[in-house]
Each structure stands twice: as C-alpha cells, then as structure tokens.
Amino acid sequence: MEAGNGDSSLTANAKASIPRGERLDRALARASDAPLREGNRIMLLKDGPNTYDDWIAEISRAEHWVHLENYIFRADEVGNRFAKVLCEKASEGVRVRVLYDWFGCLDTPRAFWRRLRSAGVEVRAVSPPLLGTPLGVVRRDHRKLVTIDGTYASTGGVCISEGWLVTSPETGLPYRDTAVNVRGPAVADLDRAFAGTWAEAGEPLPDEECPSAEQLPAAGEESVRIIIQEPRRMRTLRMLQLLTASVEQRLWITDAYFLSMPILTQSLMAAARDGVDVRVLVPATNDLALIGALSRTGYQQFLEAGVRIFEYGGPMIHAKTLVADGRWSKVGSTNLNLSSLYANWEIDLVAEDSGFASKMEQLFEEDLAGAREVRLVQTWRGEKARPEGPLDTEDRRARRSAVGSGTGSGAILVRVGSVALQKSGAPLNTHEQALSAAASGALLGSSLLVGRFPRLVAWPLAAVGGLLGGIGLLRAARSALSGGVTTPPAPDYPESDGQ
C-alpha cells in the first residue's frame, strides 16, 4: 500500500512540475489529433473581397500545383474570376485540382464544370447521392481550403460566391467572414487534409503533392494546429471541450449557425458561471431564416448562465472563429452545431500565439461595434431574451434577399436534422412553442393538401419508397450471400459533371 501511495505521489509531483500550458498543449494534441507546428507565418483575411484577392493572387503565381476545395462554388461573377485563373494555370501546365460539395453546388450548372475540365482542370464532387449509401447525403464537404505548391495555404468560412460581396443598405456594414492564410510547416497538414478528401472522391494524390511538415522550411514564428475534421471523428468538438474547460478569463466566439450541442452548451454555461467572460456573436438576420429562429430558442439559458450574446447588424456574419484568454485562436469552417462537429468534413486552424490572438480580439471588438446585445427583459410572462433595439424593416428585407451560403430550402432540411437531435429531449420554452405551433400548422396544412390532391404526391412517394425498398432488399441479399457479414463498399465517386 505504501508503495502505491509513493507512486501516486511521484505521479502528482511529476504532473505539478509540468507547466499548466504544456499540459493543456499535450491534451489538445491528443484530443484533436493535431500536432503543434512551429515556425509559421499567418495573416488574417477579413471578408470576401480581401480573401478572393489573396487567393487569386496566389493562384496566379502557382508553379507546380493548386488544390482548391470549397462547399460552394457559384458560376457567378466571383466564380468566373476563379474559373479564369484556374483555367489559365492549367493551360500553363500547373496541376490544378478542384473539389466541390455536390449538395452545396446544386445551383452550379454542369457547363461550368465542363469549362474547367476542358481547360485541363481536374474536378471532383464530394459525397454525391449513391444507391448503396442513401443516408450519405447528410455528410457534406463543408471545407473552404486553398493550398499552392506546398508554400501557401488558406482556410476560413469564405465560399466562392458574389453573396460575400453584399453590404447592408442601411448600416453600410459588410457581409462578414474571416479567413486566414499560412506559410510554413503547417501548410503540409492542410495539403494532407485536401489529399484525404480527394481520395474519398477518386484516385489519391501523387506523393509529390503531399509534402511532409519536416520538408517545409519555417516562414515565421507562430505556432498552429490544423484540425482535420472528418465524419464521426469529432476532433474539433474535443478541442472545444478542452478549451472551454480550461479557459480562465475570456472566451469570445463568432458563429453563423449557433445550434450548440448539449455537451458544448453545458461547457459554455459552466465557464460563464465560473466568472469567465463568455461572449457569442451571431447574425441578427440569418441567411437561413429557420436556423436563425431555432438558434434564438437557446438564448435564454445562455443569458441566465451569464453568457453574453450579440447580434451582428450587417447582411450576415458567416465567420466561424474563437479567441480564448488572449492566447488561443480558431479560424476555419466549423460551425458549433451537430452537423459540423460530427457529420461533415471541416478544417480549422488553431493558433497558439498572443500576437495573433490580439488581432482576433480586435476584430471581434470591431464586429461588436456593429452589433446589438441581447438581454433578459422582464415581461408580463417573465424574463425573456430580447435584443436591445429592433431591426429596420427595410434593412431586414434587404438582408433576407441577399445571396449567402444557404442552398435554398434543401439546405434548411439537411441542417434542421441537427436541431431535431439536439432539441428532442428538452422541454419547450415560449419561443420554441411558437415555432412548434408554426411547424405543426404547416404539417397539418400539407396533410390536408395531400388529402385533397393525393395524386400530387402519390407517385413521388411511391418512387422514393420503391427506391429505398429496393436498396434494402439488395443489401439484405448481399449480406445473406456473404454469410451475414457486409463489407462497406470502397468509395467510388463517379467523374462528376455537376451531379
């Protein structure tokens, strides 16, 4: 027994001898499967126009390869700017590879992809619907990533669409988003992330386009991790849990579609109750209106715990950023909701540098200057979460008409599953009751319409039912023939032409 106590004491003393920061760094590396890379130079990119200029300038200087991966790639003014420079580089002999998400680019015509391919650009779609995996549609490639020649990379929340060029007609505030570019050893991790998704959609990249971090020279003094989120891996979620549990002074978050998972919600509220300055900045008017409404249903519990919530007054704030204790900063594609943290391919850069964190805090404070705080207000029905001032009606209408990251009603349907899973076990508050009543009314109306005009939906439902039934029988037959053991099919994504 004495020996056991001695071992325990030695272990405790050993832990005490390791500085707290080093212990947290080690925990972050294990939780996120992301080693800390030193010797990098990183630069903030604010909003779409600055980000596009940076990306296009770097692409135009490419000599060996260009890797571009984005959830949305529109065939509009911005998309055509990128298409032009990508085609030019391909014609010069540069290996140009483009990954786009099948669902996110539903609105992009096939002719756009044909134009790129005819110029020599290799184009692949990620996660198109397949008969063998009908539920694979919930897995989306939500990344925004550019890597060039092993010397430059960039990631953030910016998609390729002229929606990122919008400004508010009333306030003059821009469509806000944040990206970051990086040079140095961390570029290898971003290339590795692209290589993983590229292999999901076809043949893998050649080795020369996947340099190791050890092969890349230092370019600065900043230390960063690249968190490569893949379906069901939850690496970003584990990192967020560690940070929220360890933060001591302040935690400032910007998120576009804030439907926090219960485990993260509890962590944020616990930090606020412990005296941490927890602030969350979200859009006042979301480009996915239903998601914005559902996000507000959680305001009250956060406010009661001491979390401060702000709503940005521009057309949209699409950034996915975080800064903690003036040391840790996150910039990337991951929203704080179930689909991003569990189901999607995402990518985030986490910097451990006080200088970069200071710039992130300054950017957050600039955004707060264009935001209104949500507070608890006493009403005749008790305390309710209310913003400090109403939005101008004309401005609200203009924002809702702006093109953003949503892909129509389909985007809402895919993402609303996240809400159902998060809300299913919780009692409804007043706002949720109103939303539930509206949804129930819509469902009832749809049912009456079907009852009155059954042929409108009979054939589509029969087709869907027959398809799913056939898939089920086929998989059961395969299982029986293989002795009850099914082997997951290898990814075999067809050469996509906008499908």
Which residues fall in each region the model found?
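Membrane-cytosol interface motif
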Residues: 488-495
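Charged, low-complexity intrinsically disordered terminal segments
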Residues: 2-452, 460-463, 467, 495-499
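Membrane-helix interfacial anchor on the cytosolic side
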Residues: 467-487
